[in-house]
Every structure is written in C-alpha cells, then in structure tokens.
C-alpha cells in the first residue's frame, strides 16, 4: 500500500483527495492522512514515514508547510500545489521539482506524482505498472 500525507485546508480536502484517488488508487491501496495545517503536518512527519507529501494550501501557509516537509522529511518526495504562481520560483530554489498551480489539469497532477509511484515500485520491486 502507498501512504500519502495530504496537507490542505479543510474545504479543499474532498476535491483534492478524490482527484488523487481517481488517478492512483486502482486497487484501494492508497492511504491518505489528512492534515489541516503545518503543525499537524510536522507532527505526522515526526510520527510516520510517507511515500509522498502533497501540500495543497493557499498563500504563505503552503510555503511554511513545504519548508517544514523539506526539513523533517528531506528524503520524502514532495508535491506542492498552490494558488499563487509566484511560489514556483521559490519551489525551484527549495529544490521541490513538483510545483503545481491551482488550475492544474489531471494530467499535470498525474505527471507530478507518477515518478513517486515509479520510484516506490522500483525500491519495493512491486508489480504495479505505470
């Protein structure tokens, strides 16, 4: 099974989680921990290991969460979704390759997360094909 930490404001959770599930959860093996702020994210990252961290937050709170994820779980792949395209450059400087704007398509979301799934499969030598 695959475990993702999803840090997002409450009103986004349903929509974003359903997108993740429709793209990646063919076999019901995707576990998503919902975290609603950077403090909860920090607690979760100290407590558990994840295959990926997805941050979907508006404005500077997303930046704070991204910085925290990089500090606490530097090896864990990170996807940052933001309503502010100006953060793309900051993401680049933080070496976060997967930065998505709020209006990203399912294809863009898939492309951002697919390498994570692939990386996990190679390490766990699972049979999942992408």
What are the roles of these predicted feature ranges?
Residues 1-4:
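Extreme N-terminal starter segment of soluble prokaryotic enzymes
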Residues 6-35:
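Two-component/phosphorelay signaling modules centered on CheY-like receiver
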Residues 33-37, 99-101:
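Short acidic-hydrophobic, aromatic-tinged amphipathic segments that line or gate anion-handling sites
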Residues 35-51:
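Acidic, metal-coordinating helix/loop segments flanking the phosphotransfer/catalytic sites
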Residues 51-121:
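CheY-like receiver
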Residues 120-130:
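Short, Lys/Arg-enriched segments at the junction into DNA-binding effector domains
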């Amino acid at each position: 099974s695959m475990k993702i930490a999803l840090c997002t404001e409450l009103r986004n959770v349903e929509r974003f989680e359903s997108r993740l599930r429709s793209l990646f959860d063919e076999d019901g093996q995707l576990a998503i921990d919902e975290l609603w702020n950077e403090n909860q994210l920090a607690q979760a990252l100290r407590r558990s290991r994840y295959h990926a961290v997805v941050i979907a937050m508006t404005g500077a709170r997303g930046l704070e969460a991204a910085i925290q994820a990089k500090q606490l779980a530097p090896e864990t792949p990170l996807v940052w979704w933001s309503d502010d395209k100006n953060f793309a450059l900051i993401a680049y400087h933080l070496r976060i390759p997967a930065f998505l704007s709020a209006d990203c398509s399912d294809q863009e979301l898939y492309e951002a997360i697919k390498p994570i799934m692939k990386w996990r499969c190679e390490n766990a030598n699972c049979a999942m094909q992408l």
